[in-house]
């Protein structure tokens, strides 16, 4: 009899705790509209992808313990997706097409819903093709709960102002990807970081130049991409 009473007590206690946790959860909703747009950062008009009319995508703010509910409206002529970089969440919400979900097809809506299980500054981006390179990236701020034992008053309650630094190139991202795989020195030449044999001889480094040629890596491994502009929160630096 006593064992039965204890069992009933434990079950009731667990249910009460669960109901308290559920009532404490706050659902934070964002609506994201994905559309084609045109930008001009270099004097040339190029295609980009804007979300809610902006690049980068909107900064989304949550508090640890919240439930994120993100509605994605795909108004592109191609499929898309969103991946939450570094977040601990259910696998089905991870946003990788054909792996954890089907792509969000043109003209359709997809809802991501997951608990915010951590705090910190993170970012999210498209996981479809090379859409990230033309605008589909943004920041996420996950605030610490004020009842967290590690919460620092006067520090953790200060407003967070995200600064997103990114690069922009007028080249089509698919062309960049192809050129990198071709392993040419094109981007190094554009950056002015290559050295000819004549320059090596002039500087007295002919032997070093020859030795380096025998052990050099492929250009795609050592040459960064040449960018036309650097952007600060989507604006020219």
Language model features: what each stretch is:
Residues 1-27:
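Bacterial Sec-dependent N-terminal signal peptides
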Residues 25-237:
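Histidine-centered copper-binding motifs that mark active-site loops
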């Amino acid at each position: 009899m006593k064992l039965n009473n204890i069992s009933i007590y434990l079950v009731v206690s667990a249910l009460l705790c669960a109901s308290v946790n559920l009532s404490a959860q706050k659902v934070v909703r964002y609506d994201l509209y994905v559309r084609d747009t045109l930008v001009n950062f270099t004097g040339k008009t190029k295609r980009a992808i804007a979300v809610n009319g902006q690049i980068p995508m909107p900064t989304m703010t949550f508090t640890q313990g919240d439930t994120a509910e993100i509605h994605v409206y795909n108004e592109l002529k191609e499929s898309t997706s969103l991946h939450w970089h570094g977040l601990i969440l259910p696998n089905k919400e991870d946003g990788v097409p054909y792996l954890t979900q089907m792509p969000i097809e043109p003209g359709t809506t997809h809802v991501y819903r997951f608990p915010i299980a951590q705090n910190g500054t993170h970012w999210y981006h498209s996981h479809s093709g090379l859409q990230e390179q033309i605008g589909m990236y943004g920041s996420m701020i996950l605030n610490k709960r004020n009842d967290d034992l590690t919460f620092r008053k006067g520090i953790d309650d200060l407003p967070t102002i995200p600064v997103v630094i990114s690069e922009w190139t007028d080249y089509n991202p698919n062309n960049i990807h192809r050129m990198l795989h071709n392993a040419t020195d094109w981007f190094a030449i554009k950056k002015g970081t290559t050295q000819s044999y004549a320059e090596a001889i002039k500087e007295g480094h002919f032997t070093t130049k020859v030795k380096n040629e025998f052990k050099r890596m492929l250009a795609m491994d050592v040459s960064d991409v040449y960018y036309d502009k650097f952007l600060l929160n989507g604006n020219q630096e």
